[in-house]
Amino acid sequence: MEDLYLSWPKWFSEALARYSSLEGALEGVEEIYYCGMGGSGAAGDYIEALLSIYAPQGPEFRVVKDFRPPRPPRHRGYGLVLASYSGNTLETVECGSLLSPAAGRVVAVTSGGRLLEMAKERGWLVARLPGGILPRVSFPWMLAASTAMLSGALGVDLEALKRLAGGLDTQGLKGEAERLAGFISRYRIASLVTCGPGIPLAVRLKNELAENAKMPSRLEIYPESSHNDIVALEAAEGLYGAVFIWIEHEGSLCPAVLDVVEGIYREYGVDTISIESSARGGPNATVAEYLSRTLVFGLASVRLALMRGFNPEETPPIDKYKRRLGEALRSQA
């Protein structure tokens, strides 16, 4: 799988070119719902974080990782993105069935399946994904499609972003991944510590560790975790190491918060490693940073899988869940 992750910069640049026809597809919409599960939902998390940095007065962007949103839309005519690599994700198909009738603009991000059929039947826009790859490895295509749809709100120049992504130093990133994997391999559990716009990165690392390396992890999101999770340090020494995920940006208190937390971790004898990024270079650079950090996490998780004796491609519990959920829903129909 390493070769697939190392292809990401090339794929992302290709995807930006492929999806240029979607540029601005969701501009001017005040409310946007993004329905997607697992790796397909991850791109929505990243776009939500990017909007919080570069378009705080922009559209309300709601990521739905369920059969339906927790609250129904307030107005008709909202934007809707339905992301499912296979096109058959039950939760996403159901979310689309519920939300599409009142939506003003709908985009299906998929390689095929039921979602593509629905798009053709109902005249939705489609960001067609390449087939034959693992869903979680399709992340650069998902991110490129979503970025193109909201390039204006994000302040992204697709041509400039294409050049930035294509110039990423994959060998340097591979070295970072090896260091991260070596650190995490010393512990039974990884503690992932972050704040603000680092949250989608930490969630992605958690998921990559689970799917590829079959390794449990714990997620601490600050400042909230300072009121609960941090107390586990009392019994943490030797049990877990901590990965601190920083994204510095103008006006953020997160760097100060994480600096304090890292000091406390060390007082309790817990080893730490930092993954640092910056949003000060503008939206193009930040999207490229998100892509590069996520690539590092993918490579590190594959390396960990091999160190731990697991096949990173296989996910038997997910297969069982999908099969049994389908059976359960059919029995209720």
Swiss-Prot record:
Name of protein: Bifunctional phosphoglucose/phosphomannose isomerase
Pfam name, any one: bact-PGI_C
Limits of the SIS domain: 22-160
Enzyme active site: E211 (proton acceptor), H227 (proton donor), K322 (proton acceptor)
Subunit and partners: Homodimer.
Temperature remarks: Optimum temperature is above 98 degrees Celsius.
Binding residues annotated for D-fructose 6-phosphate, in chain numbering: G39, S40, S84, S86, T89, R136, H227, K322
Entry function: Dual specificity isomerase that catalyzes the isomerization of both glucose-6-phosphate and mannose-6-phosphate to fructose-6-phosphate with similar catalytic efficiency.
InterPro entries membership: Glu6P/Mann6P_isomerase_C, SIS_dom, SIS_dom_sf, SIS_PGI/PMI_1
Keywords associated with the record: Carbohydrate metabolism, Isomerase
